[in-house]
Amino acid sequence: MDMAGLKACATTMMILVASIAPGATKSPVADAVMNGDKTALRTLLQQKADVNAPQVDGATALHWAVYRGDVDAVNQLVRAGATIDAANREGVTPLAMASLYGQAAIIEALLDAGGNAKQVTANGETLVMFAARNGNPAAIKLLAGAGVDVNAKERLRGTTALMWAVEQRHAPAVKMLVELGADVGARSGPAGLPRNYMAPRVDTTAVEAAARRHAAAAAAGRTYNEQLEWEAAHGVKISLGFRGTLNADGTPARVDNARRPFGQPAAPAPAPAAAPPPDDAADDADVIVAGLVGAGGGGLTPLIFAAREGDLESAKYLIAGGADVNQTSEYGWTPLLTAANNRHYKLGAYLIEHGADANLANKGGWTPLYLATDNRNIEGGDYPVPKPDMDHLEFITVLLDHGADPDRRARDNTLTRTIFTMQWFYENGATPFVRAAQSSDVELMQLLLDYGADPFIATENGDTALTASAGIGWVEGVTYERSPGDNVDAVRMMLDLGLDPNASNKEGRTALMGAALKGRNEVVQMLVDRGAKLDTRDGGSRDTDNSVSAIAGHRWQAIDYADGLVRVGVQSAITRPETASLIRKMMTDRGLEVPPANRVMESICVVSICQERVWKD
């Protein structure tokens, strides 16, 4: 958050409340400082007015002097007996505000006057963390010199001041913290959403709170909406602090997120029961939350934060301070993987130059090479796509030159996959070559071949680079393709390499079926000319259970895909009349049985179980 944002928060906290109830308390000194009226302040101090009289929200004159950055007013108030560590109703002290604003001169004045540098928030956030977020090295040095532990972790996410500075891209603050002994290898605590937390500033709080609400609703036998209505009627709100223990009626039996004053230590946690019952409600709730939110995230280091933010300068200070360039998060994200995922290729190249392993993969099996390939051919979606700071192909070449294995296989769909694509193309086992082929990225495919890529490696579901390029997994308006011309060239390349035009995946789908669904006549013709069979049948689409398909005759041919009878994944079927005409002609020329044109789904019993066969297998 920048200075304008910080002051906006303070304004909301102090001015708004005061404006709601003017005159609710008598605080002329605070009012004078709030208004910047130096003459009135001088007069009031001469009259021995109470410098500690708070406004309605608890803000004192010293709070306002800090907010305005008025060092002279701070010194005048201190000499007049202002309480240094007075807290407003939010528990915020003047020293905390000065730390958040990075006001080194005011911090020094307050510390000299006896301010408590070791005060912490309810979540364990220290004043050094506040100063790190602002980025003023001088403020950080003053607070650390006053005894604040630079390696303390806040309790909500387990982050340190060094992580806060890196997350805000404050390289000078990072340098100062490293010099003061900050742990460059510290790890954040566990977190939910393990596959998604690498995106900058993902807010998992709302997701987790919703998950715990689902858990509470399930325990009480209510729907989610009924739970919301029940909470509103009973004045209950299940939030992040809710641990899941419920009363018999579904009310939270314990809520541990009550606010306490800034600097006051948290109450000790109650001792755990010696032997919790097997059906403990908290355990049940946590199981539900784990399924809704996820597990295995967290464990981010300062260098991983720097890689996520693309902060090359901070990364340099961290590496110079001894950070391991191959450290991993709980999910297996390395700094290099993180930089590649977020398209911070210059930082990635720097990491490689300093020993980063180009082949380390996370638990999803994603390598820097696979992610860079995916980034170059990103599919359409409702998410922002950052611009890379280096050409994709240039970075990929850097990876390959430093030993990246072009045949390393992914184990899971990448973050960019939408629900549409994942429904009928599974990346488990896909190589960078298969991913490049899916988008007909001929230039990258050739580069990978030049570095020894094996074009014959298929996915665990049996899809080859040929089936992927031809159209298996294609989602209209979503899947990215370099161009229709590149699609023809990619298919030709793979046929020339010797890939089997009749190879099918575990659903029985072939390259010809994919080309028919896409409506690519030139590809269809090329595949048939190279031996692709027109009468091959798949294992049945989502509209017919596989066990019924064999009985009802609903195992589809390429012509059915072109006729728009086959729905794949969650997308609707698409009719390709010109492609259907071409396939019918080729089937007729070869003496194959040709199904009638102008068919619709209901006419061949796709919606309900068929009563009779339409054709023989």
Protein language model features and the residues they cover:
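Ankyrin repeat start-site detector
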Residues: 56-57, 89-90, 122-123, 156-157, ...
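Ankyrin repeat A-helix N-terminal signature
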Residues: 31-35, 64-70, 97-103, 130-136, ...
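Ankyrin repeat domain, specifically the short helix-to-loop turn at the C-terminus of the second helix
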Residues: 45-50, 75-83, 108-116, 141-149, ...
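Acidic/polar low-complexity surface segments
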Residues: 186-205, 221-293, 365-366, 371-379, ...
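Ankyrin repeat boundary signal
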Residues: 53-54, 84-87, 117-120, 150-154, ...
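Conserved ankyrin/ankyrin-like repeat signature
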Residues: 40, 72-73, 105-106, 138-139, ...
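Short, low-complexity intrinsically disordered segments enriched in A/P/G/S/L with frequent Arg
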Residues: 8-9
